[in-house]
From Swiss-Prot:
Residue span(s) of domain Cadherin: 31-133, 134-242, 243-346, 347-450, 451-560, 575-675
Documented effect of changing residue 185 to N: No effect on homophilic interaction. Changed homophilic interaction, being unable to interact with the wild-type protein but able to bind itself
Membrane topology qualifier: Single-pass type I membrane protein
Intrachain S-S bonds: 96-102
Signal sequence extent: 1-28
Taxonomic source organism: Mus musculus (Mouse)
Name used for this protein in its record: Protocadherin beta-6
Length: 772
């Protein structure tokens, strides 16, 4: 049915109402925003919801959308906050070229109910382009007879910027013969002319080189330079003159390449080689043009395709130069004629591929039609099939809404293929078709169901970040978007658990990933809930419990608590030479932060100064002697012990133990727990020890008395003769017996030795302490 050709009175009323709506919309002022070009993406252009008079969130409720004219989508609308943001960095020169002002039109489309707002974005120019000359060098041939104040045409620099940021001034390097003046064309573009100040003398200087500089009006200004090379030639006193100063021509946009556009003609009154004229296109600041000129005949032909929709009018200057360097110019104005070479374009702004069967007059699509041609070539009509229960409703400015006539019945038909036909009124007519498939679906009455009520997943500590540890799966009995399930994590009940830093879930397939390496020593397990939510409206959801168990890895080496390793003061253990086999020298104490078999420690003696003298118990770290010490054993021993855990692979730590053999060191002897003592043998040994102790005490007492008397006598003799007793000097070995008879103890201490006859042990006990 064609909406523009309605015949019945009812359709006339619809058309009349549509025209009123179009007039109302056209009369409403568009909201205009302005930003500088090259503004970074993400820039906040405006709070659109506030400017349109809506509350925050109302744009999302009404399913607001933004539609751009053209292919560039520079803006994006955050419907939740109502903010209008830049989607990408805009380039004014790429979007508008030399057009000023640069205004981009777009529409804000709201559904439920449908409403349109005309909005414009103006891009202001910034000085982001430097002037550029078309050539790095310009050659001028000037006769030596040229009079001062003669003007020579120079090629203008091109600057993509506009306004004050475009080229504003030209300067030339200091010289004695020329200065440059800056002039304006009818379109406002600046161009330079070189003015002769002082007559040239070819015999004095046959060639000059000048630097021409173009400056724009930016702050700070940008510049571009080119070299002007001047050849001084013999006299040529007539410049070429064109038959017409202005050539106007019309060219259809579908003209083939190399088609003749126009022929220009110039003549030179000079004779000989000075009368030969060469034609060339004078490149101004407007950029390259799709034309080429024959330098001999003056024929201007088409070298590139024309497009009325892109550029409808060209203006260029033709320069005729004789062999003496004199030149003349004319202007060629070319009007491009439009032909019907563009089919209508249909742009879908909003599309709903499925409609609930209970939705009355549901909107299926909002679209716009456009045709860049002009006149009847750009006028369009739009229609759909007659037998379908859908209507096309024109809104404004070539916008249409495709909606259902009333509630649909899924049981009668669950799918519709709607073909939208758009035709222009040109000759011949060009047509565009677009087919939309609409599904009629049930309402959302089934919540997602997990395959398990709870999930347990295991991950080894020290895992790689982004490791896939498992998959959560749910199904939904609905169809279409109602069955599209998205997964998300619920905040944990334990506020101390930073779940967002531990795991993440793929919203589409439920795959769980560990975001960082787990540490069993810090966290052994944690729980959280996963939500599966379908895409219905309103959405239905369900939850499942997930428990992640961290498995311990052997990532901690044993740590030795004792003996402490200190390079400045190494640990030294004292061992009496009279120690029996199995004597406890020391005990190595170590811990492991891991758990299970990764924390089971074993001890091993790797290296010793005297192999076979010491041994270490593998499970408790006790270092004991394995035999009796002899006089041949060195006094200092160095033991290297290894502490190893039971992990895979095992980790270990080593400790160095220094053992010093000493004489007369009294320390309780700790027997091996395995040794079984014979009670009768202990009683015999006890009696023997008692006898030896009494004899030793008596001998020491007698020796002490004798020494005391000898010392007293020596003092008396010394006092009588010299008044002093000389003491021999020299080093006494530390292992020699003390001649005072006091042993290794100081003279100020004595100990009472007691043997218990009924204790059943041979250990000595130190009971009383006496001071002399």
């Amino acid at each position: 049915m064609e909406t523009t050709l309605a015949k019945t009175p009812e359709k006339r009323q619809v058309v009349f109402l549509a025209i009123l709506l179009l007039l109302w919309e056209a009369g409403s002022e568009a909201i205009r925003y302005s930003i500088p070009e090259e503004t970074e993406s993400g820039y906040l252009v405006a709070h659109l919801a506030k400017d349109l008079g809506f509350r925050v969130g109302e744009l999302a409720t009404r399913r607001a959308r933004i539609h751009h004219r053209g292919n560039k989508e520079l803006l994006q609308l955050d419907v939740e906050t109502g903010n209008l943001l830049l989607k990408e960095k805009p380039d004014r020169e790429a979007l508008c070229g030399a057009t000023e002002p640069c205004v981009l039109h777009f529409q804000i489309i709201l559904e439920n109910p449908v409403q349109f707002f005309q909005t414009e974005l103006q891009l202001t120019d910034i000085n982001d382009h430097s002037p550029e000359f078309p050539d790095t060098e310009m050659l001028l041939k000037i006769q030596e007879s040229t009079q001062p104040a003669t003007v020579f045409l120079l090629k203008a620099a091109q600057d993509s910027d506009i306004g004050s940021n475009a080229v504003q001034n030209y300067t030339v390097s200091p010289n004695l013969h020329f200065h440059v003046v800056t002039l304006s064309r009818s379109d406002g573009r600046k161009y330079p002319e070189l003015v002769l100040d002082r007559a040239l003398d070819r015999e004095e200087q046959p060639e000059l080189t000048l630097i021409l500089t173009a400056l724009d009006g930016g702050a700070p200004p940008k510049s571009g330079t080119t070299t002007v090379r001047i050849e001084v030639v013999d006299i040529n006193d007539n410049a070429p003159e064109f038959v017409q100063s202005l050539y106007s021509v019309e060219v259809p946009e579908n003209s083939p390449l190399d088609a003749l556009v126009v022929t220009v003609s110039a003549r030179d009154l000079d004779a000989g080689i000075h009368g030969n004229v060469a034609y060339s296109l004078f490149q101004g600041g407007g950029g390259p043009q799709p034309f080429v000129i024959d330098e001999i005949t003056g024929e201007i032909r088409l070298k590139g395709a024309l497009d009325f929709e892109a550029t409808s009018y060209y203006t260029m200057e033709i320069v005729a130069t004789d062999s003496g360097g004199l030149s003349g110019k004319c202007t060629v104005a070319i009007q491009v004629l439009d032909v019907n070479d563009n089919a209508p374009k249909l742009t879908i702004s909003s599309l709903t591929s499925s409609i609930p069967e209970n939705a009355p007059e549901a909107v299926v699509a909002v679209f716009s039609v456009s045709d860049p041609d002009s006149g009847d070539n750009g006028r369009m009509v739009c229609s759909i099939q007659n037998e379908l229960p859908f209507l096309l409703k024109p809104t404004f400015e070539n916008y249409y809404t495709l909606a259902a006539e009333g509630p649909l019945d899924r049981e009668i038909r669950e799918e519709y293929n709607i073909t939208i036909i758009v035709s222009d009124l040109g000759t011949p007519r060009l047509t565009t078709q677009h087919t939309i498939t609409v599904q009629v679906v049930d309402i959302n009455d089934n919540a997602p169901a997990f395959t398990q009520t709870s999930y347990t997943m295991f991950v080894h500590e020290n895992n790689n970040p982004a490791l896939h540890i498992g998959t959560i799966s749910a199904t939904d009995s609905d169809s279409g978007s109602n069955a599209h399930i998205t997964y998300s994590l619920l905040p944990p009940h334990d506020l101390q658990l930073s779940l967002a830093s531990l795991v993440s879930i793929n919203a589409d397939n439920g795959q769980l990933f560990a975001l960082r390496a787990m540490d069993y020593e810090a966290l052994q397990a944690f729980e959280f809930h996963v939500v599966a939510r379908d895409g219905g409206s309103p959405a239905l959801s369900s939850q499942a419990l997930v428990r992640v168990v961290v498995l311990d890895d052997n990532d901690n080496a044993p740590f030795i608590l004792y003996p402490m390793q200190n390079a400045s003061a190494p640990c030294t253990e004292l061992l009496p030479r009279a120690a029996e086999p199995g004597y406890l020298v020391t005990k190595v104490v170590a811990v492991d932060s891991d758990s299970g078999q990764n924390a089971w420690l074993s001890f091993q003696l790797l290296k010793a100064t005297e192999p076979g003298l010491f041994s270490v118990w593998a499970h408790n770290g006790e270092v004991r002697t394995t035999r009796l010490l002899s006089e041949r054993d060195v006094p200092k021993h160095r033991l290297l012990l290894l502490v190893k855990d039971n992990g895979e692979p095992p980790r270990s730590a080593s400790v160095t133990l220094h053992v010093l053999l000493v004489d007369g060191f009294s320390q309780p002897y700790l027997p091996l727990p395995e040794v079984q003592h014979d009670s009768s043998q202990d009683e015999d040994m006890l009696t023997l020890y008692l006898v030896i102790a009494l004899a030793s005490v008596s001998s020491l007492f007698l020796l002490s008395v004798l020494l005391f008397v000898g010392v007293r006598l020596c003092r008396r003799v010394r006092e009588a003769s010299l008044g002093a007793c000389s003491v021999p000097e020299g080093h006494f070995s530390g292992h020699l017996v003390d001649v005072s008879g006091m042993g290794t103890l100081s003279q100020s201490y004595q100990y009472e030795v007691c043997l218990s006859g009924d204790s059943g042990t041979t250990d000595f006990k130190f009971l009383n302490h006496y001071s002399q």
